[in-house]
């Protein structure tokens, strides 16, 4: 755990929250103690934003539930949209060429039957077929998938229609780890952003995308505050950049050890209302 920067109470102006594993646990809902703590922080003038790997439409109910009053950061930061005006401040998809390359790799014989692959285009979910992994995902996300057989039919260079994010799912966590290592060997960070949001999700996005860069957009383009005036809370590898960015970066209690190591503070787990504990500790 990193030493906390000099950040007295009252200094934080922006609180950025991840969804899954942070404000929403197994129930897929935000528990009352967490809601009350968020509202108490807002009553003291703290602004609240959501930063998630979820689709925009899937994240919207959480944004509304916590009364977030800033544009919603979705798709690991690849999509930033105002929920009131619907103005999209930022959208950076993967190129058509790169998406096709990645699909070729993920559909190699040694991987194809062991993976579900999701393409997210214009806030719609496209899959080859609807199987167990995808059914579970659809249930939690609240988004019905579009089964298209061959995902290549979704890629249209003429329209520059390409995925905001690509997700490979497998219950075989060793396979997900293996894929992460192998794809990192094929592409430099300047070419592709790679992360895991949970142990069974391998995610690919444009290299100029991560939650840290998205929070920086809110901070500098919209709010004109400093990183030291930001507190971020997350639970997995896709949260690392925003935890490092903020004056106070909080990891959840059941985060991977590598994520806890870069945080300034470790909260209890999501099922123990860790976000409420963190807000009470630092903001109230």
For the regions a language model picked out, list residue spans one by one:
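Hydrophobic packing residues within well-ordered alpha-helices of enzyme cores
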Residues: 34, 59-63, 179, 183, ...
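Short, structured coil segments at secondary-structure junctions
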Residues: 66-68, 75-76, 190, 245-246, ...
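Asp-based phosphoryl-transfer active-site loop
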Residues: 11-27, 102
């Amino acid at each position: 755990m990193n030493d906390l920067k000099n950040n007295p109470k009252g200094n934080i102006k922006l609180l950025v929250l991840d969804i899954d594993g942070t404000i929403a646990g197994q129930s897929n809902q935000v528990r009352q103690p967490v809601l009350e703590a968020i509202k108490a922080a807002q009553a003291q003038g703290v602004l609240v934003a959501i930063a998630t790997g979820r689709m925009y439409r899937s994240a919207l109910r959480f944004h509304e539930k916590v009364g977030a009053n800033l544009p919603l950061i979705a798709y690991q930061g690849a999509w930033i949209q105002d929920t009131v005006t619907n103005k999209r401040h930022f959208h950076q998809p993967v190129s058509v060429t790169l998406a096709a390359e990645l699909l070729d790799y993920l559909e190699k014989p040694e991987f194809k039957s062991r993976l579900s692959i999701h393409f997210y285009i214009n806030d719609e979910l496209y899959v080859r077929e609807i199987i167990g992994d995808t059914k579970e995902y659809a249930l939690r996300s609240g988004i019905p998938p579009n089964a298209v057989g061959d995902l290549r039919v979704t890629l249209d260079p003429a329209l520059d229609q390409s995925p905001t994010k690509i997700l490979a799912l497998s219950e075989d966590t060793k396979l997900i780890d293996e894929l992460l290592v192998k794809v990192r060997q094929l592409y430099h960070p300047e070419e592709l952003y790679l992360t895991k949001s949970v142990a069974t999700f391998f995610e690919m996005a444009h290299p100029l995308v991560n939650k840290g860069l998205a929070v920086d957009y809110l901070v500098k383009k919209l709010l004109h505050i400093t990183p030291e005036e930001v507190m971020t809370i997350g639970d997995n590898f896709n949260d690392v950049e925003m935890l490092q960015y903020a004056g106070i970066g909080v990891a959840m209690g059941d985060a991977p050890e590598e994520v806890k190591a870069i945080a300034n503070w470790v909260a209890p787990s999501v099922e123990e209302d860790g976000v409420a504990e963190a807000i009470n500790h630092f903001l109230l």
